[in-house]
From Swiss-Prot:
Keyword Membrane: no
EC annotation from Swiss-Prot or TrEMBL: 2.1.3.2
Assembly and binders: Heterododecamer (2C3:3R2) of six catalytic PyrB chains organized as two trimers (C3), and six regulatory PyrI chains organized as three dimers (R2).
Name this polypeptide is given: Aspartate carbamoyltransferase catalytic subunit
Species this chain originates from: Salmonella typhimurium (strain LT2 / SGSC1412 / ATCC 700720)
Length: 311
């Protein structure tokens, strides 16, 4: 059947409607249950990481290989013409797009992925993270995990903790969950790392309930999902980082009184914000969440690169 995501750029979670999200998640579930090792057999995909990454890059490249695609690219722009010779991003993308069927791209500069779409011709660009702006494929695996564990994506109580200012994952996830009905958000962060006002304004416009809190304890008994984030050292000056890094830490003892099916998620890497004793509790779900990245990214690649898809 024809699908609306064929050859579509995926730069922001706002590029996907609620129906699009449901299509990706349904496709991910099918691929998890029934692997398709030759679905992208004759496709070549560029994996272009201008910024360091472990999970996102390996998850994307594993997804490509498991669907049968060929993979080219780099994990460090320092050894490319852009890094060594001063080639522009526009020229880099213009050239790469002549070689491949799709470009997966991470870049430290906000807006870089959107800029790349202006020079990629008919080749779709998938944003694997652009600065502190957007991380749509992380959001897809987050949604897939929430749906798997809670059985729904509406009427949920979701707490987001830590670096809500620079954490692109929480920006994208909040925007995505706002497409569904009845969700309530609890934001727990230091004042210096509070959720951006444009996100709060968006929730107000959609009539979504939200509130600000000073501790995890305040909301523990009320939430279905506790979404932890690390304080991003690379985006703060050293003195600011030292002041806030340990302000919100989750320990196993903090989970007393949590709902039985409440799950703790984290986009990883974690530093000190979740102690290892949490790993042994039934609430810890961040490693399963990371594993779901394979299926969410496989689904997106399959849909973007196939005009018709029947699984």
């Amino acid at each position: 059947m024809a699908n609306p995501l064929y050859q579509k750029h995926i730069i922001s979670i706002n590029d996907l409607s609620r129906d699009d999200l449901n299509l990706v998640l349904a496709t991910a579930a099918k691929l998890k249950a029934n692997p398709q090792p030759e679905l992208l057999k004759h496709k070549v995909i560029a994996s272009c990481f201008f910024e360091a990454s472990t999970r996102t890059r390996l998850s994307f490249e594993t997804s490509m290989h498991r669907l049968g695609a060929s993979v080219v690219g780099f994990s460090d722009s320092a050894n490319t013409s852009l890094g060594k010779k001063g080639e522009t991003l526009a020229d880099t993308i213009s050239v790469i797009s002549t070689y491949v069927d799709a470009i997966v791209m991470r870049h430290p500069q906000e807006g870089a992925a959107r800029l790349a779409t202006e020079f990629s011709g008919q080749v779709p660009v998938l944003n694997a993270g652009d600065g502190s702006n957007q991380h749509p494929t992380q959001t897809l695996l987050d949604l897939f995990t929430i749906q798997e564990t809670q059985g729904r994506l509406d009427n949920l109580h979701i707490a987001m903790v830590g670096d809500l200012k620079y954490g692109r994952t929480v920006h994208s996830l909040t925007q995505a969950l706002a497409k569904f009905s009845g969700n309530r958000f609890y934001f727990i962060a230091p004042d210096a790392l509070a959720m951006p006002q444009y996100i709060l304004d968006m929730l107000d416009e959609k009539g979504m309930a939200w509130s600000l809190h000073g501790s995890i304890e305040e909301v523990m008994a009320d939430v279905d999902i506790l979404y932890m984030t690390r304080v991003q050292k690379e985006r703060l000056d050293p003195s600011e980082y030292a002041n806030v890094k340990a302000q919100f830490v989750l320990r196993a003892s903090d989970l007393n009184g949590a709902r039985e099916n409440m799950k703790v998620l984290h986009p990883l890497p974690r530093i000190d914000e979740i102690t290892t004793d949490v790993d042994k509790t039934p609430h810890a779900w961040y490693f399963q969440q990371a594993g779901n990245g394979i299926f969410a990214r496989q689904a997106l690649l399959a849909l973007v690169l196939n005009s018709e898809l029947s699984l």
